[in-house]
Amino acid sequence: MTTLDSNNNTGGVITYIGSSGSSPSRTSPESLYSDSSNGSFQSLTQGCPTYFPPSPTGSLTQDPARSFGSAPPSLSDDSSPSSASSSSSSSSSSFYNGSPPGSLQVAMEDSSRVSPSKGTSNITKLNGMVLLCKVCGDVASGFHYGVHACEGCKGFFRRSIQQNIQYKRCLKNENCSIVRINRNRCQQCRFKKCLSVGMSRDAVRFGRIPKREKQRMLAEMQSAMNLANNQLSSLCPLETSPTPHPTSGSMGPSPPPAPAPTPLVGFSQFPQQLTPPRSPSPEPTMEDVISQVARAHREIFTYAHDKLGTSPGNFNANHASGSPSATTPHRWESQGCPSAPNDNNLLAAQRHNEALNGLRQGPSSYPPTWPSGPTHHSCHQPNSNGHRLCPTHVYSAPEGEAPANSLRQGNTKNVLLACPMNMYPHGRSGRTVQEIWEDFSMSFTPAVREVVEFAKHIPGFRDLSQHDQVTLLKAGTFEVLMVRFASLFNVKDQTVMFLSRTTYSLQELGAMGMGDLLNAMFDFSEKLNSLALTEEELGLFTAVVLVSADRSGMENSASVEQLQETLLRALRALVLKNRPSETSRFTKLLLKLPDLRTLNNMHSEKLLSFRVDAQ
């Protein structure tokens, strides 16, 4: 995914995650690594033209997506400008090392850099940064066959597919390392590397949006995302008193984020609530971990399947029986708001709306129970950003149940909810592609806010250093959101239902340049939904996805690893308890982690290709 160094006044360094890269000691632009070859939430600082908030992906040790990443060198066009790139005194800002060997990076261009022999006209640059070839790490000349590549690797791949060349078998078990200086040594490994990083005859450029429109759009998104990232990364906690650690018995209210002065709707209330590290609290029991994480997941997250009118029970039952989610009809569908999301959590709806409109004024607490009983309202016209705004359904507690801290229907005001997943907010006529992306990119703050809130309630998360808290959030947000919204994908019909209750076919969305990523999302959703996770299992799995000790740039990886092991033990105990006869279920669930990393890599590359095409 793309990452932006907020400490670099010249615009930062963008890196590709998941491709094979070159050695930092080579003569072409020095390899720079993002602060997480794992997904890095830093991508949020950049434009967001994909389906989920950009968040760089992380490298998992057994990530199958990189099984070919270390493929051996192969032959290249040495007459190409890329192969002739000469030494550079890379003027990069300091970055975390440890990105997986294969990341395609972007190097800051220095005034002392010597351009390739054929001049700089064929070098792909982005705001003074030079993009590197995903195959060999040389200077990329453009976007070729679906990836950024040098002229040498482009020509090599073209000849390979046009002439259907069968290369000699590799003498090193197909384990050669492909870098610029040795890419000619093993043709088989080089061709294998080309395929593994995504080169394809059928690959097309992303977007096809006019250059001027892209530049305008990217400038606006860059400003908004920079602001959001600066707020998230701020080391100044807003709480005046320490936040009590949640216990299994009660979940304390979370202090509200203080509004930041900004005219940008959707980013004025970006979370800054990460707390500084505290003295280690007593290690909770496994039962406490399960109950606290499950409660936080239930009360903080607004489930995608709930918004689509499916209760948690029906959701799991549907998946267990093989039928798609969100198919159970509800009586409210024909009573006045057919396109509004069925939100079972009023306060979650309030958080969504307040994040978009900057309305949060005071502290709020989480509801203790799932509300029920919708009161319907008519839909409103789209707002200035194109979002369909519908009054959120007002819920009252079941008869006979009136918790002291629950909301009473009579005291509840209507809340307008702008759906974060609504890609085409109100119809599609007259909307250009860039307008759709623009509206969509500005609607993800609520979803990201919920990830931050959820992280704060993971037992032990706030005991980590603030740097590690931020690093984990930057690296894992995209993966968490992918888990959350997996139920929106109907694999059988090859459709996606957004929170506006509008269904789009894979063909429709693929026409916008996201075909490969969407196919991978469908595949992941099918695998995850087939496991029919319970609410508690889904919450613990989400926590495991977020707390990953192999993220690069960690200050105290031992503490993160200890927390991760605690969560894994709790997840394993819960899975075995729920279905003791299915001994392989826990293993199947863990195998979804590398799938998430692969998705994060693809998401990052799509985002970067979108930005580069605007240049």
From Swiss-Prot:
Crucial for activation of GJA1: annotated segments: 49-285
Stretches assigned to the NR LBD domain: 285-615
PTM text: Ubiquitinated, leading to its proteasomal degradation. Ubiquitinated by the SCF(FBXW7) complex when phosphorylated by CDK1 leading to its proteasomal degradation. Ubiquitinated by SIAH2; leading to its proteasomal degradation. Rapidly ubiquitinated in response to inflammatory triggers and sumoylation is a prerequisite to its ubiquitination. Sumoylated by UBE2I, desumoylated by SENP1, and sumoylation is a prerequisite to its ubiquitination.
Reported effect, T275A: Loss of interaction with FBXW7 and loss of CDK1-mediated phosphorylation
Compositionally biased spans, kind Pro residues: 253-262
Chain positions covered by the region annotation Required for phosphorylation by CSNK1E and cytoplasmic localization: 1-70
Family: Belongs to the nuclear hormone receptor family. NR1 subfamily.
Protein name listed in UniProt: Nuclear receptor subfamily 1 group D member 1
Organism encoding this protein: Mus musculus (Mouse)
Gene that specifies this protein: Nr1d1
